[in-house]
Amino acid sequence: WGEEKFRAALQERLNKPLVPAGVDLRSNEKSEHIGIYRQKQPLMNYVGLKVPVGRIHADKLQGIARLAEKYGNGEVRFSHSNSLIIPNIPDQKLGDLLEESLVKEFTYHPSSILRGLVSCVGIDYCHLATIETKARALQVASELEDKLPDTAPITMHWSGCPAGCGNHLVADIGLLGKKIKRGKEIVDAVDIYMGGRTGIDPKLAVKVMEDVPCDQLANVLEFVVPYHTREKMYPIKGKKYTRKWKQSSPGSAQKQVKLIENPILETKASHEELL
């Protein structure tokens, strides 16, 4: 029949018009609104500041409000990517704003890892969470910045429980918190998901590793991230590779990461054959 004939027949049966949903405004263009951007208004700008994992103390938030009053129109906005936005900054005030200490602390040009870092509130304030997320997310990000200073932009989202408030299923790397037994002790751990994205062609992330202890996570991600920057995410879509983390001797992260390395390379080769 085709879409138009089906729509006409359905409207006839329902005896009422079917209003179109409108224009799809989704796009694959990614913007966390972190940085310096021109506004539509002439000679006006907005500055997006990264607040690492969304945690900011009251005195510093008040300081941001004072900056908004001094350099803008007193307005501060918040984004889903854990950032603060100060809009309506005239050109002549922009340079002075960028020299403020708070702007240097909550920078508008974070590293490629910190830029895409998002975390749910974690066990500190949520009774559903199984692990602490915010401090761990910062710690892992800091270690990865040292290990991978030149990595391409990547999103890394932490969720402390299956409720998924950190949106781990739509990130390049999603981390889902859990507890595991290691020897005789119970420790914080994560399942690792990869390949999620939003936009015009959304995809849910694929779980590729299970039960990775948080205290060894940075060592694992050091070897995983290079395969999963945005340019290399798509080969693993649609396939599920689940591997249990196997504890072994210290310093063996390179051997352990091979649990997932071969499946990734295998699907990468298959993907390239289709091009």
Question: What spans do the regions from the language model cover?
Answer:
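Peripheral terminal and linker regions in Fe-S/redox and tRNA-modifying enzymes
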Residues: 1-275
